[in-house]
């Protein structure tokens, strides 16, 4: 773990229940939008699962996103108002798929109130304590299908 690239990211990330691996994300790219005047209309986090990695062992049926602020971890605000997504959708023999999250409120809050230290999030299996399900994810440095934060935004007059 000491050899992980915390600046450029990794090509592969892992998630596993029963006290196993979690994935930490930093949304440092959002810093460029601070004080820009842009308004985020919709934000979606897409986390692709490496094709074929969940044939032998099932992937978690859904993931949760926690905001990390020092040693405190809390569910992001989007979970308090309806379904933010995070369910695994797959197709084909090799179970190619992705987790998709609606994170609009969280991104808006970060841009409005957050300091840059709060741009850190953690992906965890929804039933972390009771399920051994695991997944191999495409990391942010994956050349073919990286994790992505898709933003739809406008600049008011």
Language-model regions: role of each:
Residues 1-157:
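Secreted, disulfide-rich extracellular signaling modules
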